[in-house]
Every structure is written in C-alpha cells, then in structure tokens.
Amino acid sequence: VNYTMDPDKIEALITDKTSAIIPVHVYGNFCDVEKIEQIAKKHNLKVIYDAAHTFGAEYKGKSAAAYGDASIYSFHATKVFNTIEGGAVAFGEPWMGHRLNCLKNFGIVDQEHVVWVGGNAKMNEFQAAMGICNLRHVDGEIEKRRHVAERYLEHLEGVKGLKLPSYDNPDWKPNYAYFPVVFDGFVAGRDLVWDYLASHKIYSRKYFYPLTNEFQCYQGRFSGEQTPVAKYVADRVLTLPMYADLAMEDVDRICGLLKEIK
C-alpha cells in the first residue's frame, strides 16, 4: 500500500465533463504511472501530477517530471528541497511555459494585453537564491533521511498494530520525505499516540486529517464514504519526525516512547 490513487477506480468516475486526471504522489510514493497513462490515452485526457512530495525521488530512473503532461512541485519549507516558500511546474510542451508565465503574472501577455484570469504567483529573487543554495545539498539531505528511516524501521518493525513504509520496490528511488505510520490494532489509537508524544515535546503530524470533505468550505461536495481508503488512512496515520539533522538518539527516544505506550 502506498496511499496513492487506485487506477482501477478511475474509469468509473470519468464523465463527458472530465478533461484531466490529477493524481497525487503521496509521501514521495509514485502513483501507478503506467496504468494512469493508459487510461488517459484511452479517454484522451491530460494527466497533471501533484508532485509536491517527490522532489529527488525517481521511478525507473526518471523523476516525477518525466510522467504526465505536467507535474507540480512544492518548495515549501517542510519539503526535502525548499525555497522557504514557492514551487514549480514541470512540463513537456513549450506552449505551457508561455501560458504559465502569463498566468503567474496576472494573465498579462504583453504591455497591452491581458488574455487570461491570472494571479500573482511569481517567486522572488531571494527565494530563487535560497533554492540555488539548497539545491547543492539535496542528495546529502536525502541520504541523511535514509539513515533516519532505517533507524525507525530497526526499532518498529514487528511491533503489533503498526503499518510502516516499505522501501523494497527496486523501481523506486525514495526521497524519504516522510515516515508515515498507520496505527491499526496498536495498543492505543492514533490520537492517543499523538497526545502522548506531544506530552513529551515530540510533534508528529496527523497528515491529511481531517479529510477535505470535512472542511467547512467544502462540506456537502462529497462524502467520506466515496473515499474509504483516504478516510481509513486519515483517521489512523501519523508522520513521525523526519529531517536530515534528526539525531539517532532522538529517533531512539521517539521509538522508545511508542513502545512504552500501554
């Protein structure tokens, strides 16, 4: 299980209003890009990937940018590679570059023409400089994160009621962006675990909780019953602390606290 879109559920949702499929590479796990591409070609649809979690990860020797019609990256401060705030769109068609340059600049085409409804989505020079500085450290950042993930696995593999991330897919080069743990059958529920860790000044995250349909601004748009796997994960997952400079003794302490929960 990698928490990404189930390609077998896509075709039943396609209508005459559908113009694109927007899958999410979750926690740095790649979607089933081959199946999604086949479905998109069959129905003449575009594929736009949410690649926010995947900078530095690869599938079959290629980055997420190599798949789909476009991939959208986040350079938020919490990501493996960041510019404090910002992001990027990767694409293969040159016309997309022209369109995006206009859309990120209020829809302005030239001094006299505004063709599209756009916004102000430009990165500033400071953010760009920050990105250039960070870019040289990405490989080292990922390698350090790998050691953290391996330490978590050493401690937590075999603990009843914990579903841990798996890194054994030979086609996938992970970036270790997150360390998600699903609590199902553990001695305590996810929320109690979160509270216990927080009481010891350890801050995990209930990632994707609550679900979008539970937000006030989206209520009534769709039911959680339509996305049972997302609801299952949202109600049970914690992402444990994960960053390159996380000390091994801190990982040991986090895991020790988890194991002492009764």
Q: What are the residue ranges of the model-derived segments?
A:
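Active-site phosphate-binding strand-loop segment of PLP-dependent enzymes
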Residues: V1-T83, A88-A90, G189
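PLP-dependent aminotransferase class I/II
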Residues: M5-D8, A12, A20-V24, N29, ...
